[in-house]
Amino acid sequence: MGAMIVREVYEIAEKIKSMEIRGAGKIARSVAQALMIQAEKSTAKSPEELWTELKEAAKILYKTRPTAVSLPNALRYVMHRAKIAYSSGADLETLRFTVINSAKEFIHNSEKAIERIGEIGAKRIEDGDVIMTHCHSKAAISVMKTAFDQGKDIKVIVTETRPRWQGKITAKELASYGIPVIYVVDSAARHYMKMTDKVVMGADSITANGAVINKIGTSLIALTAKEHRVWVMIAAETYKFHPETMLGQLVEIEMRDPTEVIPEEELKTWPKNIEVWNPAFDVTPPEYIDVIITEKGIIPPYAAIDILKEEFGWALKYREPWED
């Protein structure tokens, strides 16, 4: 008999796949919540049965989005603690409590990290700054909102972020706080870089050498910022650092459906020898980045390895908690 997985786990997994749940931080908090719901609603009669369910739920969630490392790092946070409890002979209710408590702890820490990044990053924003941003990052928005709330006169240039228009979400959110916003097409980034003082963007994953994997278009903005000698600041929680890259693993870049770029009905009329490629992310080399703002402080890109060793060194010693 297979593991009994609650409906909410499948629903959250599907929402992550379809990008109804989007953004690395929100994805991470959602998978932690999914494990918590599995533990809360499970009808397992033994710790062994619950542990089997948790592993199966984690596998379902793990397969949804390959690039955003926040997802497996959230799973690791909860499942590693659950595995320690299970391996130590915890009874059913103790194991259930461990999962629920660990998930709540992760979600709380994640939300606090965004606040802290805002406080730290705002110190680098000056009165009168024009800031450019790309896609939709809660951490990056926290930096800009905190600076604005401190009374700094700022204006934000928001790129549309094709093909899914996440820039619209960012523009509306910033405007709702009272921040003046200029909304531009992605290809206008270089044109408006000459009036930009700082670039503040988020990250989906950060590698051991300090490279940043983020929404497609990020690297072009960072490149043109370097050309114009404009500071590039990446705002990212430490759970977005990618532990496997310490062992040489490359980050898989997710390829999404061509119909996100060209509507399906139109695409059917196109010549068959035209391929539409739709990578969701690109890689920005560390030399295009000035600083990474984390909840632990501001670091240069080359110090990413230190964060990884401190936060995830333990993860390299074991198989994934849901694999054995």
Curated annotation (Swiss-Prot):
Fetch the Pfam families from UniProt. Answer: IF-2B
Q: Which residues cross the membrane?
A: none
Binding-site residues, substrate:
R22, G23, A24, G25, R65, S137, K138, A139, N214, K215, K240
Q: Which reaction does it catalyse?
A: alpha-D-ribose 1,5-bisphosphate = D-ribulose 1,5-bisphosphate
Domain of life of the source: Archaea
Q: Which InterPro entries match?
A: IF-2B-related (IPR000649), IF_2B-like_C (IPR042529), Initiation_fac_2B_a/b/d (IPR011559), M1Pi_N (IPR027363), NagB/RpiA_transferase-like (IPR037171), R15Pi (IPR005250)
Recite the UniProt keywords alphabetically.
Carbohydrate metabolism, Isomerase
The answer to keyword Isomerase applying to this record is: yes
**Residue positions of the active site:** C135 (proton acceptor), D204 (proton donor)
In the UniProt record, does the keyword Isomerase occur? yes
Sequence similarity = Belongs to the eIF-2B alpha/beta/delta subunits family. R15P isomerase subfamily.
Further remarks about this protein from its record: Reaction proceeds via a cis-phosphoenolate intermediate.
- Please explain the role this protein plays, according to its UniProt record: Catalyzes the isomerization of ribose 1,5-bisphosphate (R15P) to ribulose 1,5-bisphosphate (RuBP), the CO(2) acceptor and substrate for RubisCO. Functions in an archaeal AMP degradation pathway, together with AMP phosphorylase and RubisCO.
Q: Per its record, how is this protein called by name?
A: Ribose 1,5-bisphosphate isomerase
